[in-house]
Amino acid sequence: MKKQDNNMTRRDFIKTSSAGLAGAAILASPLGPLAGRALAATAPNLAIEKGATLNVLRWSVFVSGDKDLWEANCRKWEKATGCTVVNEYLSWEDVRPKAAMSAAVGAGPDLVLGWHDDPWLYPDKLVDVTDVAEYLGAKYGGWEDACIKYGVKDGRWIAIPMGAPGQQIVYRKSWADEAGYSEFPKTTDEFIKCCKKLKSMGHPVGFALGHSVGDGNNFAYTWLWSFGASTVDKGGNPAIDSPETRNALDGMKELYSAMIPGCASWLDPHNNKSFLAEQISVTNNGISIYYAAKKDPKLQNLAADIYHAELPIGPIGKPTQLHLFDQAFIFKHTAVPNAAKHFLMFMLEKEQAEPWMDAMIGYVTPGLKDYRNLSVWTSDPKNTAYRDCVKNMLWNGYPGPIGPGSAAVMAEYVVVDMFANYCARGMSADRAIERAEKSIARAYRR
């Protein structure tokens, strides 16, 4: 979008941002074979409800720059439109139940920044945002495949992908060097060896095997898939009872032997705190640990020693990453649907999105392909590992369908608990898999 002149009138701004923008780009269409076609980047004509108050529910931040620029961009939108934005920030695990309650009762926030396949739990309650999604995709190089998988149902966009608070490997460079790994391992086999060597040197690792919304689920699914295992097959039938799952369990148990005590009960903040306290040498996390160290004058030596690497690749031989995935969706009970759609369009235009990315040093990886070229990914080489999170991401029900089943399996921590039961609670592999299989079958029957 053309940068706004400070003297532009509110009416001019709305007219320009709603109808006058045009350009050419390639849009990854919501449905497979159309993916290469070019569409004109013409913004939808949205008649914003006069004096609208937009109530937004979103997850609380782990890096202050996220909130600072989010709020600043909200004030820009308010000034330009004459509307008001009220943001409510909740802990990550509290967003899903509150959004579900709002969907059930038909009241509450107008717009929610939720997780993964939340919109698939109540698609009939949501405003169609196809016009906004196709405009943004056309203008900014198309959407990554995972965005289309999550955002499109029955040929229409039910949510706007905001991006992924990605997770990669965070490690202490000097300790890895001492262990003989000047280049951090890229495969699960070498990764396990490295972590065990670090533990033997007095530098244990730490990975959440508790009910951790982000770090626990993401690492468990990534690890499972990397061995060629999955919760279900393409048809949504339970597939967890397999030799590949047993290999994944054994690999995780080896890794668990290198972990600091207590990981089986860790939630999302625990590995951040342990890493910053120099109690662990390796974990999976967003860029928030590095961000926190950089911002603290007392932790500058630690910040210099923090490096990032992509999640290790398992026997399957290719990236199998899962990341937290943030989707914005609008409830039909809102009285201001056009304001809500315009707000999302505005927030993902480059003029707002790029400063937001810069302020949080890439904590959220965008789903629009052109945003892989933002300077934030190369201005500090330590940010680069997070650039392709959405590009390399699978969906949480992979390789099966997205829907209530995949959402329930993740929300109930079925995969995380399977690993924790085997690694930390003395359960046999057969028993851990059996319990997981029953939970998966129940979830997909709902």
What are these regions (language model features)?
Residues A43-N45, V63-G82, V415:
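Short, polar/charged alpha-helical segment
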Residues A41-I48, W115-Q168, I192, F219, ...:
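Hinge/lid segment of periplasmic solute-binding proteins
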Residues M1-D12, A25, L34-A35:
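N-terminal secretory signal peptides
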Residues A47-I48, T84-V85, D177, M393-R446:
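Conserved C-terminal helix/tail region of periplasmic/extracytoplasmic solute-binding proteins
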Residues A72-W143, V152, S174-K186, S274, ...:
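Extracytoplasmic "Venus flytrap"/periplasmic binding protein-like
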